[in-house]
Regions:
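Active-site-proximal cap/lid insertion segments
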Residues: 1-64, 68-114, 127-137, 244, ...
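Long, internal low-complexity/basic segments
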Residues: 5-30, 243-245, 263-315
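A structural signal for well-ordered alpha-helical segments within the folded catalytic domains
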Residues: 36-50, 93-94, 115-122, 126, ...
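Polar, surface-exposed loop/tail segments
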Residues: 63-68, 108-217, 275, 293-301
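Short clusters of hydrophobic/aromatic residues that line enzyme substrate/ligand-binding pockets
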Residues: 77, 147, 263
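C-terminal, low-complexity/hydrophilic appendages and adjacent surface loops
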Residues: 90-92, 169-265, 308, 314-315
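Short loop segments at secondary-structure junctions
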Residues: 102-105, 129-131, 153-155, 220-222, ...
Length: 315
């Protein structure tokens, strides 16, 4: 976690998680036990899923039912010396399954096109088969792409057939500052009356200087992420601004699929690539988030989310 190029948010998250879940020494036997538990959770989930599928068969609904299977996150499970899911963009955490079973199409075919959870609603609407004008009316103003047209020949769809990249955003206050997490847990354990608990929690203030917010884009070849203070929402336009206000990761997913070598450690060598990916991230952020000014954040006493570049240096 202390290797050069690792964002400080990785270690801070693991420290905060230790507060909530307990210490987890870096020992092989402990990682094996964690993975054993995780795999058994998956097996248990599969058994419940199997029960649903069997019931569809019993009700003779299988050939009249579209099934969509996905998840909200994975488990780091020891990868990169991390566990849980939090302040990172590693594939073990954010690359989740997306399986669509449609009775009108053959199964067991993989599609390599990039998708995003924003695409779920447009896809579900697309799978209804209703008139296009009605679907467009229902989806008016919504973000995301309809992946249902790819079902006919998913193996033929290119990497960017649906979208130029997949956007990932993260900003979880509870895990941004381990000391804040410890104070939060202590208060939670005191079992105060609800009103007193709310007042006590409101008096706590995490250290917003920690760069725990994440904006990431995966274009299929490269994964680019910047970690920033949640009090410093901004759209970097230059390399200097990017490096000054962010911890940066850049992975070559073709030549480094395990994401072990952060190319952003050599910013001058990869200047052009960094700025290309930064521009892609900015464009996708504008398209799918809009004005990324932090206004979605909950209120804290004295907090101000939409900081200008000049104001950022005060924090």
């Amino acid at each position: 976690l202390d290797e050069p190029g690792r964002p400080a948010a990785h270690k801070e998250y693991q420290n905060a998680r230790a507060v909530m879940e307990g210490q987890f020494p870096d020992e092989d036997r402990r990682w094996r036990k964690l993975l054993d538990y995780y795999f058994n959770c998956i097996r248990d989930n599969d058994q419940h899923l199997e029960a649903i599928l069997n019931e569809l068969d019993n009700l003779q609904l299988t050939q009249n039912t579209i099934i969509v299977f996905t998840a909200d996150h994975g488990e780091l499970g020891g990868s990169h010396q991390m566990h849980g899911k939090g302040s990172s963009v590693y594939k073990e955490q954010i690359h989740v399954p997306m399986i669509i079973r449609h009775p009108a199409y053959p199964g067991n075919i993989r599609c390599n096109s990039l998708t995003n959870h924003l695409d779920l609603v447009p896809t579900l609407i697309g799978l209804t088969g209703r008139d296009r004008s009605l679907r467009e009316k229902v989806l008016e103003g919504r973000k995301g792409r309809d992946m249902s047209p790819l079902l006919a020949h998913p193996e033929q769809a290119g990497l960017n057939a649906l979208r130029p990249g997949s956007l990932y955003c993260y900003g979880m206050i509870l895990y941004m500052d381990a000391q804040y997490t410890a104070k939060f847990r202590k208060l939670a354990g005191e079992k105060l009356p609800h009103d007193q608990f709310k007042k006590a929690i409101a008096s706590l203030h995490p250290d917003f200087s920690h760069r725990s917010g994440i904006r990431m884009i995966n274009d299929g070849h490269y994964k680019f992420a910047r970690y920033f203070s949640l009090k410093q929402h901004h759209i970097p336009a230059t390399l200097a601004e990017l490096l000054e206000n962010n911890d940066v990761e850049l992975f070559d997913l073709v030549n480094d699929p395990e994401e072990n070598h952060n190319l952003a450690r050599e910013p001058e060598k990869y200047r052009d690539l960094l700025m290309t990916m930064n521009d892609k991230l900015n464009q996708l952020t504008a398209a799918e988030i809009g004005e990324d000014d932090g206004s979605y954040m909950p209120p804290f006493e004295g907090s101000q989310w939409d900081l200008t570049a000049a104001q950022m240096h005060q924090y």
